[in-house]
């Protein structure tokens, strides 16, 4: 089956979900036209954007058949099919299963926890969405445990889900690096996590 071709990516490079896609594309060496969307100015909520994209979020990928893809992992899945190597989502079925398992664990247990803390405790976001500061602090209280889960997974391993970098590592990196924004340090003693983080930061694709 011939895949539709990418037209442009609606982007905000420093936002977590777009950054996942941007790292993924950089690892694959894929260049694409980008349209930078100013979230703080509310450009993602403008009528023209909503009419085209359908939801007030980034990233969003426009394809030449008119399709719009708005979920970051789905965008990565498309580009994995378009350019299978270097492979980051699994070649054989069981490898795909393990990678997706860890991608979802990292996304729902760590990435989402960091995001909830940020979205509900950062005063600059109050104009963009309803906040519940208590819920933000509940999630902050979960972070050390979630980071500990990742540290244990990395015992004796270079990468989270396979023998190479995968989308699970990309999701984890974006979550861990966002800890700086919410002023939450990595606890002492998480040596496996810190070694992995140094390895990830050494990759050109992850440069901010």
Give a label for each model feature.
Residues 25, 205-206:
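Short beta-strand edge/turn micro-motifs at domain boundaries
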Residues 2, 103-204:
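GST-like fold's C-terminal all-alpha helical module
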Residues 1-133, 137:
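GST-like domain detector, emphasizing the conserved glutathione-binding G-site
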């Amino acid at each position: 089956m011939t895949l539709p071709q990418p037209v442009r990516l609606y982007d905000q490079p420093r936002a977590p979900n777009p950054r996942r896609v941007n790292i993924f594309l950089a690892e694959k060496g894929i260049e694409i036209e980008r349209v930078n969307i100013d979230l703080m100015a509310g450009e993602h909520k403008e009528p023209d954007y909503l009419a085209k994209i359908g939801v007030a979020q980034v990233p969003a990928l426009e394809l030449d058949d008119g399709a719009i893809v708005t979920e970051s992992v789905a965008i990565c899945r498309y580009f994995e099919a378009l350019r299978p190597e270097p492979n980051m989502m699994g070649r054989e079925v069981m490898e795909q299963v393990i990678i997706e398992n860890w991608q979802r664990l990292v996304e729902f247990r760590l990435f989402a926890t960091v995001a909830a803390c940020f979205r509900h405790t950062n005063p600059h976001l109050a104009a963009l969405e309803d906040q519940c500061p208590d819920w933000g602090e509940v999630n902050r209280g979960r972070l050390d445990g979630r980071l500990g889960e990742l540290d244990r997974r990395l015992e004796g391993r270079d990468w989270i889900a396979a023998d190479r970098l995968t989308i699970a590592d990309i999701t984890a990196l974006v979550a861990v690096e966002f800890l700086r924004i919410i002023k939450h340090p990595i606890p002492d003693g998480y040596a496996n996590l810190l070694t992995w983080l140094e390895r990830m930061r050494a990759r050109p694709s992850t440069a901010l």
